[in-house]
Amino acid sequence: MCIRDSFQDEYKFGASADLGFNSEFKLNSKLTMNVFFLNGEGYKNVQDNDGNIRQGVSFFYDLPKGFETRIYFDSHDAKDASAITNSSFFLGYKADGGRLGLEYNKLNNARNYKSSEDGYNRDGFSIYGSKKLPKNYELFVRYDQISSNILSGESNAWNYNNDGSLLMFGTQYQATKGVKFNINYRLFNHDNSVINNKSILSLNAEFKI
């Protein structure tokens, strides 16, 4: 299913795609390691003036009985500030009838992956799943929680107006190979009760050639 950006993309913990070097090592039949050196600003942006790159490592382990796990860490040096670090942990389950996933993400010393700021941290988790139905239908649901830390001398988190939770659910229909339609409902519930919560009902189409 393709109904929304990943947690990392949605909350700008990392770029959806980037330019650089990635090498994969098969350590054994169950464990794979990736080592990468990337531009750090995403493929749409040029290298920063200081020439700093994003470097990191990830481990993917294939657990028994349809379970899998992934640990990820990267670091991006910044001028006149501590390095931006981004880490995540994923646990998933996949079977013929559906999928489940749970991930936790943490971004340190940054407002987002391109904007360094000492002591500004964000973290959150995402739970999602899908269930296949007869006649090429599929149900899906997702819940996110995103938060930021409280800085010294402040009473609220530094990103309080954008902290909160996202609930999304809907159904998807695969008309033929490469053609999918889905309808979904999204509700973002702000931690700041003064801000009106945002809800959207949308219909999407996906075409792959």
Question: Positions of the model-derived regions?
Answer:
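Outer-membrane beta-barrel pore domains
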Residues: 61-209
